Amino acid sequence: MKKTGLALVLATILLGMMGSVHAQEPRVVKVPACIGLNQSQVATQVKRDFLQNRIPRWEADKKQLGTDKPVVWINVVDIIGKDDIWQVPLIARGNKGDKTYQVVLDCKSGTMTYTGLNAQTRPDPQIGLNSQAGPK
């Protein structure tokens, strides 16, 4: 009986540590025209837009990340673009976990499309600790 209970507790903890992977509905937003940007400028524009305009309005994402001021990074070498249409992978990290977005910046039409690809939550460090163990 103890082994079954322990196995269930461990399974629950392991499932909690694994992130859920799913794609969200794309969110399309209007942005100023941005024709002629290079990869570095695209990364700067997408990061600024996400931090200043999107995350303050996206309550579910703030809740999932655990903050309204996530750390955001974009690897410039991963940006793909042609004819002023750019695909930009963006990663946001918060207190509760990470979230990856695929962003398409269409400089000609002045739109940016955010698709949340996945989220990974970090386990609560207090879960699973032996409450009877104290300082020695």
UniProtKB/Swiss-Prot annotation:
GO terms for cellular component: extracellular region. InterPro entries: Uncharacterised_YebF, YebF/Cmi_sf, YebF/ColM_immunity. Residues 117-136 are annotated as: Disordered. It is found in: Secreted. PROSITE patterns: YEBF_CMI. Residues 1-23 form the signal peptide. Residues 30-117 form the YebF/Cmi domain. Its main location: secreted. Keywords: Disulfide bond, Secreted, Signal. Disulfide bonds join 34-107. HAMAP family: YebF. NCBIfam families: PRK13680.1, YebF_not_Cmi. Belongs to the YebF family. This is Protein YebF.
